[in-house]
């Protein structure tokens, strides 16, 4: 199979937004207009193509990032008449599935940020925007739902500037809002676009309506000033009053969008089929191709030397696995982005994280959950492979004779856990295997065994996250399970630096055991996890025993010294030690490492940490006092408030332990009229009284 379009004609984009901003409907319309669909699906009737899991069809929300590909020939602009390939990832907007957004942004070259014209910039819009900033992803903004009562394009543009700190530049302004939304004014061409009342594929180009001419001129000047500010040649022409051509405006807009100094803003109503084709033109016109993004940086797995891979078919193959999924028909699917080279079905790749060589059985071009077999993939492509057994999310796969490790993905630790057991004893093994498969797919889902009770615990990013995974157990793996009440995933850390000697000696006939280590433990910045430094000099501990010390420390960190919770953000340095030529072993040093760490942690001012959530409540004004009083009673700290879309909003930081059952309480205190969103913010020290109560609980449990 030859390359269908040149690399500079490829766009890898994501569609990202707050829940219910219309992402899936917009993607459906894109697929319809690009010829991938012959009938449009609607989210509200469960017929949307991109929402392919049973739970997504029932709930009307997108949980996994479905990937698809389509082709588009722009009608206007510098790229008009040229066929382009657009690979699209439709990402979830619910905060419990932030990991899906994170991993798709990692492999994309651009994004369409959707905003609801009524709700404006909502909490999850901010979260997703920050994630896109982290990866430097160029964006265009599409203000959707212009047909809804209360729609306000200009308020949304203002909110993008104020709440997201971005530089939004409208390229269109709406003709009518709400029920009378008919189309828009194209500010580059200064023409009106009025849609016909069919499927939206036809429209009339008209002169700008008389009552909008002054406003259109004002916004065009605003656009020209914005593009002139980022280009000296254009600025000179603008100041001299010379005419600036349409081609010049588009070229400078493209450069500024790729640098994320300007966010082009468009408007439409995907549901009413208005604006989507012009948004596709903008995707091609302003978002990056793999050529614009340039070389990807990595390092050699053995020498650690930096390695760069150009986005060219002639380069050695390098790709990044960004998602694992289980398909009922073909088994394990590994979604990957090709950064360089060509990969053929049936060939071998090296996984540089495991050092193992694996064979690519088949390569599939995914269209939501449908698929077609293809012979090979080229630089810039996104596809799915069948046959990779040990590849995990974030692993690099590459040409075995030219190894490279691309930058890994970092995922947040789970904040909530529940006990789970099968309804029937016969399903015990099946439950274990099914949970392992789900954990392989989702890096923020963890499975562990409580050492004291023997219970299986599952941990995730929120109640909905775990609820859907338990639901998948039943639907996909035919395992029915009972689950306990949600528990907070507490953590522990230390506040002081301490040195401590860990010694393990056993003499009881036969071969003895001996290991002695001197450890220094010190606190790390929040979010840094764990760091182990080997500072041994002069061979006082043989090299082969040092990994065992590290393993012993990590084993001890799983059960902290305050209340038995995992410890985090700690640096451990192995300073000194002793060994015995006959009695020393890996096991002895592992135990010595564990003893040394526990002893040091007890003296290093250990503290208990709890997850703090960023909570935003949107409520009618008459319930504002009740909402604020209730948040304060939950140990919440009010951080700000304001007005949006005719309602009041309150931003606060609240411990997760105080938020269980909040949706029911909020519903009853506001007669169902308020809603809220919540996302993990950070870990913070638990108040002393609560920490002491949890310690007592642990002591009494140990005595039982």
Curated annotation (Swiss-Prot):
SUPFAM superfamilies: EF-G C-terminal domain-like (SSF54980), P-loop containing nucleoside triphosphate hydrolases (SSF52540), Ribosomal protein S5 domain 2-like (SSF54211), Translation proteins (SSF50447). Keywords: Cytoplasm, Elongation factor, GTP-binding, Nucleotide-binding, Protein biosynthesis. GO terms for cellular component: cytoplasm. Pfam families: EFG_C, EFG_III, EFG_IV, GTP_EFTU, GTP_EFTU_D2. Residues 8-291 form the tr-type G domain. It comes from the Bacteria. GTP binds at residues 17-24, 90-94, 144-147. The keyword Transferase does not apply. CDD domains: EF-G, EFG_III, EFG_mtEFG1_IV, EFG_mtEFG_C, EFG_mtEFG_II. It is found in: Cytoplasm. Its main location: cytoplasm. One of its GO terms (biological process) is ribosome disassembly. InterPro entries: EFG_II, EFG_III, EFG_III/V, EFG_IV, EFG_V, EFG_V-like, EFTu-like_2, G_TR_CS. GO terms for molecular function: GTP binding; GTPase activity; translation elongation factor activity. PROSITE patterns: G_TR_1, G_TR_2. Catalyzes the GTP-dependent ribosomal translocation step during translation elongation. During this step, the ribosome changes from the pre-translocational (PRE) to the post-translocational (POST) state as the newly formed A-site-bound peptidyl-tRNA and P-site-bound deacylated tRNA move to the P and E sites, respectively. Catalyzes the coordinated movement of the two tRNA molecules, the mRNA and conformational changes in the ribosome. Belongs to the TRAFAC class translation factor GTPase superfamily. Classic translation factor GTPase family. EF-G/EF-2 subfamily. This is Elongation factor G. It comes from Chlorobium limicola (strain DSM 245 / NBRC 103803 / 6330).
């Amino acid at each position: 199979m030859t390359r269908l379009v040149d690399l500079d004609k490829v766009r890898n984009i994501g569609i990202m937004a707050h829940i219910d901003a219309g992402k899936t409907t917009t993607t459906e319309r894109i697929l319809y207009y690009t010829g991938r669909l012959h009938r449009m699906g609607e989210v509200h009737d469960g017929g949307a193509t991109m929402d392919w899991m049973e739970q997504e069809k029932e709930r009307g929300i997108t949980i996994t990032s479905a990937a698809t590909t389509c082709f588009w020939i722009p009608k206007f602009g510098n790229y008009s008449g040229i066929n382009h390939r657009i690979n699209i990832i439709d990402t979830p907007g619910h905060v419990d599935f932030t990991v899906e957004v994170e991993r798709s942004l990692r492999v994309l070259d651009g994004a369409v940020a959707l905003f609801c014209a009524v709700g404006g910039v909502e909490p999850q819009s901010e979260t997703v925007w920050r994630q896109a900033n982290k990866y430097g992803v160029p964006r265009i903004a599409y203000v959707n739902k212009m047909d809804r009562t209360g729609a306000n394009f200009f308020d949304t543009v203002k909110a993008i500037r104020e709440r997201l700190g971005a530089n939004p530049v409208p390229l269109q302004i709406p003709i009518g809002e709400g029920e009378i939304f008919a189309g828009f004014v194209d500010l580059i061409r200064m023409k009106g676009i009025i849609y016909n009342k069919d499927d939206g594929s036809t429209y009339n180009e008209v002169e700008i309506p008389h009552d909008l001419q002054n406003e259109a001129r004002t916004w065009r000047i605003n656009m020209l000033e914005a593009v002139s500010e980022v280009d000296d040649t254009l600025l000179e022409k603008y100041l001299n009053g010379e005419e600036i051509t349409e081609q010049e405006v588009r070229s400078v807009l493209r450069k500024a969008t790729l640098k994320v100094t300007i966010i082009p803003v468009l408007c439409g109503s995907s549901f009413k089929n208005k604006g989507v084709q012009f948004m596709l033109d903008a995707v091609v016109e302003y978002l990056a191709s793999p050529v614009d993004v340039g070389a990807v940086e990595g390092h050699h797995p053995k020498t650690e030397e930096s390695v760069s891979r150009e986005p060219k078919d002639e380069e050695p193959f390098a790709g990044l696995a960004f998602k694992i999924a289980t398909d009922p028909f073909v088994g394990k699917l590994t979604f990957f982005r090709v950064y360089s080279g060509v990969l053929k079905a049936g060939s071998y790749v090296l996984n540089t994280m495991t050092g193992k060589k694996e064979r690519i059985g088949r390569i599939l071009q995914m269209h939501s959950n449908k698929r077609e077999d293809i012979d090979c993939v080229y630089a810039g492509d996104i596809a799915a492979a069948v046959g990779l057994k040990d590849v995990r999310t974030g692993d690099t796969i590459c040409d075995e004779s030219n190894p490279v490790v691309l930058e890994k993905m970092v995922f947040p630790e789970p904040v909530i856990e529940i006990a789970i057991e099968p309804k029937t004893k016969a399903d015990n093994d099946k439950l274990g295997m099914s949970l392992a498969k789900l954990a392989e797919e989702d890096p923020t889902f963890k499975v562990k065994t409580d050492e004291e009770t023997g219970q299986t615990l599952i941990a995730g990013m929120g109640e909905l996250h775990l609820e859907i995974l338990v639901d998948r157990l039943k639907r996909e793996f035919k395992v029915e399970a009972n689950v306990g009440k949600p528990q907070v995933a507490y953590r522990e850390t230390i506040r002081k630096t301490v040195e401590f000697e860990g010694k393990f000696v056993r003499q009881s006939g036969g071969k003895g055991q001996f290991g002695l280590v001197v450890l220094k433990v010190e606190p790390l910045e929040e979010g840094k996890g764990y760091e182990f430094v080997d500072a041994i000099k002069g061979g006082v501990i043989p090299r082969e025993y040092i990994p065992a010390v590290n393993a012993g420390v990590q084993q001890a960190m799983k059960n902290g010294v305050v209340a038995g919770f995992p410890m985090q953000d700690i640096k451990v340095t192995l300073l000194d030690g002793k060994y015995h030529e006959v009695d020393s072993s890996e096991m002895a040093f592992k135990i010595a490492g564990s003893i040394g760490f526990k002893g040091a942690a007890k003296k290093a001012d250990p503290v208990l940490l709890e997850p703090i959530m960023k909570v935003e409540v949107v409520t009618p004004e008459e319930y504002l006092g009740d909402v604020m009083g209730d948040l304060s009673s939950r140990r919440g700290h009010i951080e700000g408030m304001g007005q949006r879309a005719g309602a009041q909003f309150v931003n606060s930081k609240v411990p997760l332990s105080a938020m269980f059952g909040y949706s029911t309480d909020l519903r009853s205190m506001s007669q169902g009229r308020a809603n809220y969103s919540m996302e993990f913010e950070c870990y913070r020290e638990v108040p002393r009284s609560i920490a002491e109560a949890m310690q007592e609980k642990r002591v009494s449990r140990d005595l039982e």
